[in-house]
């Protein structure tokens, strides 16, 4: 197989492609600056940056194209007023309560995902899910002529100028101003800085304002080259986190150099034109180079990347983690009456579709399938304490594997019926859980979340969206299950088996070992628990459950749809599980029913808004909805009576003597 070049190697062509790559590279560099500065000031990785960029880009287009506002005043209003105000609002309502409660990186990340999902849901409600064209380009115009006949776009020049100005401004502010001194103090120790008189909340608010400003700048810069898509643009900007991770969330020069370098490399790869079937793969590498970079950067960064001021990992995302002394039954919906009530509600919701017809019944077919996918999140995150954002990828592998086996597209195997194909796809996908389980041995929290997110995104781009996965596949149900009600009954039986398997996993010695690993990994190691083996087991079981659910989703729709397993949907599913209660199996079933029911019964985007609001409010809802019955039943114990110091006793006596 030979690889041909699009044109003879020449310095002129190389320079032209490098100049073209500066457009995307400069946007990635701006994204890196915003992420690094925001992390310096707040200690939090702005994981919602992509959604913030999308929101500002949509608002600018709506005001300029639809309402015919003038471009430059509108641009100034969006970037200098709306975007910073959004950042301050998010700091006050979302992140500040988490900081005051001393939440760990896991809860902080979930709150950021809540903001991400919420903004996407709002965009879908306001502007619809269909992509929109015609985003305004403030710096549009004739290309700038350079010596030698080369050209450079005016907006690229503007972005490079913004990088220079922002970089110098941040460096000058950090080194030579009082604000920079306060910033360094807050970064070193927020509580100690507050005790010395530093307004840590003000520093944090400025950090979030700057982060959303740069996010808006990135969205405005990229929107003219793309169709505005409420799912595509946030994911594209999120992929540029690679430059900040490569800089270890500390070095602005490294982030800028990485962003520009990746942009140029992505452009230079367009010269490759391999012959044969390699062309789609090479094109996928060229268009998704930032995904590869994010995966590589997250793996090379190791466990040192954190998303908050607490040590990496923090408290587990469970309904038990906030309760004094733990308590029993946390993983079963809160135990007692709360667990029985949740079970009754789930049973009613699962039986209701037997009275549905037509489109309502076809929509309900997705509920048991999605519940199995969400159960995989419960096993990995709720029971195992490992933050995995890539379960949608395993669900897609289950659906794609079933379709390939049924279509006779697997070498050496004939076309299989639906049931054997589904079971074989699950068995083949389960060991692939080791691909994310191995990195989990040395990583927790945000470091692991970035690896699993990049892995799921890579599966979506390099596997699900390739031509072989989108053409010529069949997913016909067995004759006995061809009817929607019969197929729904079969799904319920498989869901019941999945719930029994998860319940068995959570009981006995294995369940106690998983709980020990989740609650305190170092203590579990000291007690002789095989922590690496348990992590691998959690990911393998999670991959199998997700693959089973994904295969059922494909059979329910009678087709493989790559969009159903988009990484953004995976983020929504993860946030929904945490909101329902990360260690609650019944909560996963309830979350699946609500996700499907809200979108099918109302307007697309309502479920994302609901999940986003609850996830963003995780600081006020520790443990999720599953913890509410326990929180009401078991209020926190009274604090022991305080004991005054000698100075306090003298002050009390003085105050008591006053008339």
PLM segments and residue spans:
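Hydrophobic alpha-helical bundles that form the membrane domains of multi-pass transporters
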Residues: 161, 168-248, 252-255, 262, ...
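C-terminal ends of transmembrane helices
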Residues: 33-42, 88-98, 243-247, 376-381
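Short, hydrophobic transmembrane alpha-helix segments
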Residues: 5-18, 36-45, 62-74, 351-362, ...
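Alpha-helical transmembrane segments and their immediate interhelical/interface regions
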Residues: 67-93, 208-218, 405-428
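Membrane-interface helix-loop junction between the first two transmembrane segments
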Residues: 37-51, 181-184, 312
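Transmembrane alpha-helices and adjacent helix-loop boundaries
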Residues: 3, 12, 24-27, 31, ...
């Amino acid at each position: 197989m030979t690889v041909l070049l699009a044109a003879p190697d020449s310095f002129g062509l190389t320079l032209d492609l490098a100049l073209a790559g500066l457009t995307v590279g400069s946007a990635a560099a701006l994204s890196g600056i915003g992420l690094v500065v925001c992390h310096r000031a707040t200690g939090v990785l702005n994981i919602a940056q992509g959604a913030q960029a999308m929101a500002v880009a949509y608002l600018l287009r709506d005001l300029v194209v639809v309402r015919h506002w003038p471009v430059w005043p509108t641009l100034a209003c969006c970037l200098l007023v709306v975007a910073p105000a959004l950042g301050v609002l998010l700091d006050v309502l979302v992140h500040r309560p988490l900081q005051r409660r001393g939440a760990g990186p896991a809860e902080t990340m979930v709150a950021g995902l809540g903001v991400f999902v919420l903004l996407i849901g709002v965009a879908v409600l306001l502007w619809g899910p269909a992509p929109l064209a015609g985003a305004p380009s403030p710096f549009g115009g004739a290309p700038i002529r350079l010596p030698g006949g080369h050209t450079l776009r005016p907006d690229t020049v503007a972005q490079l100028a913004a990088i220079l100005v922002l970089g110098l401004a941040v460096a000058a502010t950090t080194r030579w101003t009082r604000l920079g001194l306060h910033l360094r103090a807050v970064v070193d120790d927020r509580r100690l800085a507050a005790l010395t008189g530093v307004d840590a909340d003000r520093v944090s608010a400025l950090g979030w304002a700057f982060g959303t400003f740069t996010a808006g700048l990135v969205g405005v810069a990229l929107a003219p080259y793309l169709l505005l898509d409420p799912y595509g643009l946030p994911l594209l900007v999120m992929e540029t986190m690679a430059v900040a991770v490569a800089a270890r969330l500390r070095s602005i020069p490294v982030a800028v150099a990485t962003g520009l370098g990746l942009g140029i490399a992505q452009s230079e790869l367009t010269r490759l034109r391999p012959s044969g079937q390699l062309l789609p793969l090479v094109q996928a590498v060229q268009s998704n180079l930032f995904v590869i970079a994010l995966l590589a950067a997250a793996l090379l960064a190791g466990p040192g990347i954190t998303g908050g001021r607490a040590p990496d990992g923090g408290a587990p995302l469970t309904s038990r983690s906030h309760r004094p002394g733990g308590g029993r039954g946390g993983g079963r919906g809160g135990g007692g009456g709360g667990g029985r009530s949740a079970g009754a509600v789930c049973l009613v919701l699962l039986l209701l579709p037997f009275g549905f017809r037509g489109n309502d019944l076809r929509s309900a077919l997705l509920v048991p399938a999605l519940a199995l996918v969400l159960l995989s999140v419960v096993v990995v995150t709720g029971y195992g304490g490992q933050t995995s954002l890539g379960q949608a990828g395993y669900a897609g592998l289950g659906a794609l594997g079933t379709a390939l086996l049924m279509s006779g597209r697997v070498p050496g195997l004939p076309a299989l019926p639906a049931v054997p194909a589904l079971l074989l796809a699950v068995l083949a996908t389960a060991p692939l859980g080791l691909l994310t389980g191995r990195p989990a041995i040395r990583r927790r929290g945000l470091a692991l979340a970035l690896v699993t997110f990049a892995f799921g995104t890579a599966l979506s781009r390099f596997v699900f969206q390739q031509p072989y996965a989108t053409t010529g596949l069949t997913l016909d149900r067995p004759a006995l299950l061809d009817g929607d009600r019969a197929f729904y009954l079969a799904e319920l039986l498989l869901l019941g088996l999945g719930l029994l398997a998860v319940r068995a996993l959570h009981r006995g010695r294995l369940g106690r070992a998983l709980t020990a690993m989740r609650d305190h990994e170092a203590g579990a190691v000291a007690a002789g628990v095989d922590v690496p083996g348990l992590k691998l087991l959690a990911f393998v079981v999670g991959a199998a459950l997700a693959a089973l659910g994904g295969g059922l989703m494909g059979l329910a729709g009678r087709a493989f749809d790559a969009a159903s397993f988009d990484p953004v949907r995976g983020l929504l599913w993860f946030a929904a599980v945490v909101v329902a209660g990360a260690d609650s199996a019944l909560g996963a079933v309830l979350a699946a029913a609500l996700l499907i029911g809200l979108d099918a019964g109302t307007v697309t985007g309502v479920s994302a808004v609901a999940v986003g609001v609850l996830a963003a409010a995780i600081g006020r809802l520790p443990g999720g909805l599953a913890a509410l019955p326990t929180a009401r039943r078991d209020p926190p114990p009274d604090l022991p009576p305080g004991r005054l110091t000698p100075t306090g006793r003298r002050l009390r006596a003085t105050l008591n003597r006053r008339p």
